[in-house]
Each structure stands twice: as structure tokens, then as C-alpha cells.
């Protein structure tokens, strides 16, 4: 089974200060390793035997296309106002080829082995979410600053990898859309699971897998996390410190 890769290369509303520090107004076009960062995950996806084609979504698809070498497996489309609405549009499009692997233009360290491990871990799920465990990442990169979600048994950061196996995932995306504009959307989603889930999360009574299982039962879906062995899967380029770190990794200095 081969996936259709969805690469999100959009921009935040308003001025992107990070991008402007590097001479552009789009984060996907910031140079990493001497080339626009979006090229790196695109090249990795096209080289993966797990991927049949790649759809790149952006508010300015022509600008993204202008920096990507042509390939018949590539398709460029305009994204909607939000990520959730963009994904709902894909769910409702009869031309969408399932399953989908969703990642982002700032995943500059994505490699074929990460994709392969994630896809194997996502088998038989309806939704799978790639994560990296805190201890593994900090062992590799002790000074890396990431956002950590803490649960009983461990803390995790996201790996910007999501597997959506069929249109059955639509209720989960609708739930995401309902909280997408909330700055504390993670807590809002947990609140929607009910007081037991909220209290359990606050007190760290649940593991990550247990909380995702609760969400899955609420939605009638099989949802789980795939903990990736390569800590670099948890590193994206979202701020100047990330850019410095990734450049150091690519140059073999970190």
C-alpha cells in the first residue's frame, strides 16, 4: 500500500517574522542547507518507496512550484484558510487517493527511514500521529528547545507526521476544526473528552496511548501514536534557534 503525501507549505496569517529574518515572506522558502527548505522534505518523499505521489498545499502554490524541480508525481494546489479546512476539503474530494501521509515544509531533516518506520507503525490505524520521546531527543540534542506534552510514563514532542488511512477520519478533523483557532487547542480537545480525561491529563494519570484511545472511542476510530526511534524526527525549523540547530546538524556539527 502506497500513500499520497500531503505536504503543507502554507503561511501563518499576517507577517511571518521568522521568514523575514531570512529575506522572504514565506517560511517554506527560507534557505536551509543552501536551498529553500521545502525542497528537502519534497525530495525525501519522492525518494521513498512508500509514497506514490506528493500534493503540495500552499496559499501561493505557484511560488512554491517555482523552487521545486518538476516531477510527474508532484501536484501543487491552493490551501484553504486553515489546515483543518484544507484537510476536510481533501476528505470531501472524490479524487483523493487514500491513505494520506501528512507532513510539513519545515520538516527539513525528514528521511526515508523515518517515513518507513512511521508507515509501519501506522498500519491498521485510522489515524496515526508521529512523536518523539523527550529522553531520546535530549540525549541526542541536549540543548534543543521543543514543546513537550507530558503524560504518565513520558513526555513527547510531535514529529509533524500524520497518517490518515481513509475518509472515516473526517469526524476527527471536524473536531480539530472546532478548536483550531484556540491558542490552547490541545487542552480544549482534552476538555471535549470529558471531565475524567481532563482531570486524568492534569494529574498525569493517563499515558499518551490511553488518552488517544479515549479519543478514538469517542470518535469511533483507531487512533494511536507512533514513537519514532530517530530523535531528529522531532526537529522542525520554526524559529531562528531551530534554523541554527538544523544547519549545524546538516554540517555534522551537532
Description of each model-found segment:
Residues 1-23:
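N-terminal nucleotide-binding beta1-loop-alpha1 segment
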Residues 22-40:
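Short catalytic helix/loop segments, enriched in acidic residues and glycine
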Residues 44-51:
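Short, acidic, metal-binding catalytic loop of nucleotide-sugar glycosyltransferases
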Residues 61-66:
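Short, charged/polar "capping" segments at the starts of alpha-helices
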Amino acid at each position: 500500500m502506497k500513500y499520497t503525501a500531503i505536504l503543507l507549505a502554507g503561511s501563518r496569517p499576517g507577517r511571518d517574522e521568522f521568514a523575514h529574518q531570512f529575506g522572504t515572506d514565506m517560511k517554506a522558502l527560507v534557505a536551509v542547507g543552501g536551498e529553500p527548505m521545502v525542497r528537502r522534505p519534497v525530495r525525501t518523499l519522492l525518494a521513498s518507496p512508500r509514497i506514490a505521489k506528493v500534493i503540495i498545499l500552499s496559499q501561493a502554490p505557484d511560488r512554491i512550484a517555482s523552487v521545486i524541480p518538476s516531477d510527474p508525481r508532484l501536484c501543487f494546489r491552493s490551501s484553504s484558510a486553515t489546515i483543518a479546512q484544507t484537510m476536510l476539503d481533501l476528505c470531501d474530494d472524490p479524487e483523493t487517493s487514500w491513505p494520506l501521509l501528512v507532513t510539513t515544509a519545515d520538516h527539513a531533516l525528514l528521511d526515508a527511514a523515518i517515513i518507513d518506520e512511521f508507515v509501519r507503525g501506522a498500519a491498521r490505524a485510522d489515524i496515526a500521529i508521529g512523536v518523539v520521546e523527550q529522553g531520546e531527543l535530549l540525549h541526542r540534542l541536549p540543548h534543543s528547545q521543543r514543546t513537550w506534552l507530558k503524560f504518565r510514563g513520558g513526555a513527547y514532542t510531535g514529529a509533524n507526521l500524520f497518517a490518515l488511512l481513509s475518509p472515516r477520519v473526517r469526524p476527527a478533523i471536524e473536531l480539530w476544526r472546532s478548536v483550531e483557532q484556540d491558542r490552547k487547542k490541545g487542552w480544549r480537545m482534552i476538555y471535549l473528552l470529558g471531565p475524567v480525561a481532563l482531570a486524568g491529563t492534569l494529574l498525569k494519570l493517563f499515558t499518551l496511548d490511553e488518552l488517544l484511545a479515549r479519543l478514538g472511542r469517542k470518535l469511533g476510530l483507531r487512533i494511536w501514536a507512533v514513537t519514532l526511534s530517530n530523535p531528529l524526527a522531532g526537529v522542525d525549523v520554526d524559529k531562528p534557534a531551530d534554523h541554527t540547530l538544523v544547519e549545524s546538524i546538516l554540517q555534522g556539527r551537532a
